[in-house]
């Protein structure tokens, strides 16, 4: 029986196979975007002994359904910034989370915080798209990618001068992503295969 993750990845990989855009052209276009704000730098510059908060903008989820029907990214991003967030995470997946690239652009235009594009990255073109929509970091999910993909995606993110946040769920995945060069690691308490949450 397939999981939420399997279904979402199948959808994105099908879309990727139908994407005929030139990778070289996308890399060139991504290089023309204004400089990133420094996602990792913002997290690391949080005052000593204070937690750096990545505040999230999400309209819905596969497991919980609609979360906020009238969410306004510009307003929410400003409120998060006023509240002391170090960075933002914006869902751009429309099919399963109700997000869009416009949500990210709107949030970024309304505040000065660096932004993580939270989506399912399955192709090098996705990394380019992340930069083209002016995000400052790309999300890479260890459970969704093999070592070769992780290494290539991190390398391209570095080339485009954006940060890569690599998401893991357990210690084995931590060891895996460190080997391929992950610099920022996020721990998801939710197992993306079962969608169960483990708070231990």
Predicted regions span which residues?
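Alpha/beta enzyme core
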Residues: 68-91, 110, 124-137, 150-164, ...
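Glycine-rich, proline-tolerant flexible connector loops at the mouths of alpha/beta enzymes
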Residues: 24-34, 62-68, 86-106, 142, ...
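Non-cysteine beta-strand/loop elements that form the S-adenosyl-L-methionine
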Residues: 54-56, 141, 186-188
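Glycine-rich beta-to-alpha transition loops that act as phosphate-gripper elements at the mouths
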Residues: 56-60, 67-71, 94-98, 117-125, ...
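Alpha-helix-loop-beta-strand connector modules within alpha/beta enzyme cores
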Residues: 38-49, 97-122, 142, 150-167, ...
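An N-cap/entry alpha-helix motif that binds or orients negatively charged groups
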Residues: 2-68
């Amino acid at each position: 029986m397939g999981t939420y993750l399997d279904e979402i990845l199948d959808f994105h990989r099908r879309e990727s196979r139908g994407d005929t855009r030139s990778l070289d052209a996308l890399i060139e276009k991504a290089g023309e975007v204004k400089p990133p704000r420094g996602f990792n730098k913002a997290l690391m510059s949080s005052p000593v002994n204070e937690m750096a908060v990545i505040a999230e903008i999400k309209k819905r989820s596969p497991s919980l359904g609609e979360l906020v029907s009238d969410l306004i990214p510009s307003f929410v991003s400003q409120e998060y910034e006023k509240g002391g967030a170090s960075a933002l995470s914006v869902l751009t997946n429309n099919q399963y989370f109700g997000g869009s690239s416009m949500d990210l652009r709107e949030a970024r235009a309304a505040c000065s915080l660096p932004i993580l594009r939270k989506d399912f990255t399955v192709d090098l073109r996705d990394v380019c798209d992340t930069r083209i929509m002016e995000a400052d970091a790309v999300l890479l999910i260890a459970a969704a990618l093999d070592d070769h993909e992780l290494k290539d995606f991190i390398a391209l993110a570095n080339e485009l001068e954006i940060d890569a946040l690599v998401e893991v769920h357990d210690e084995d995945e931590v060891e895996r992503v460190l080997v391929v060069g992950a610099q920022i690691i996020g721990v998801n308490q939710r197992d993306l295969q079962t969608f169960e949450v483990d708070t231990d």
